[in-house]
Swiss-Prot record:
Disulphide-bridged cysteine pairs: C4-C17, C8-C31, C25-C36
Tissue spec: Expressed by the venom gland.
Organism the protein comes from: Brachypelma albiceps
Family named by the database record: Belongs to the neurotoxin 12 (Hwtx-2) family. 06 (TXP1) subfamily.
Listed transmembrane segments: none
Residue ranges that the Swiss-Prot or TrEMBL entry lists as coiled coil: none
Domain of life from the UniProt record: Eukaryota
Any GO CC annotation of this UniProt entry: extracellular region
Subcellular location: Secreted
SUPFAM superfamilies assigned to the protein according to its UniProt record, in alphabetical order: omega toxin-like
Note, other: Negative results: does not inhibit insect and mice voltage-gated sodium channels (para/tipE, Nav1.2/SCN2A, Nav1.5/SCN5A).
The protein, known as: Omega-theraphotoxin-Ba1b
Molecular function terms, GO-annotated: calcium channel regulator activity; toxin activity
Statement: the UniProt record of this protein carries the keyword Transmembrane helix: no
Length: 39
């Protein structure tokens, strides 16, 4: 499972790719260079 390397607080479509307190991205989001990507 891919883990976020950067703290990804940027929200896209109203949903954070990495909720605060979580170590992994959820909901199909992935963090890439501090950007949220839906895969």
């Amino acid at each position: 499972i891919f883990e976020c390397v950067f703290s990804c607080d940027i929200k896209k479509e109203g949903k954070p790719c990495k909720p605060k307190g979580e170590k992994k991205c959820t909901g199909g989001w992935r963090c890439k260079i501090k950007l949220c990507l839906k895969i």
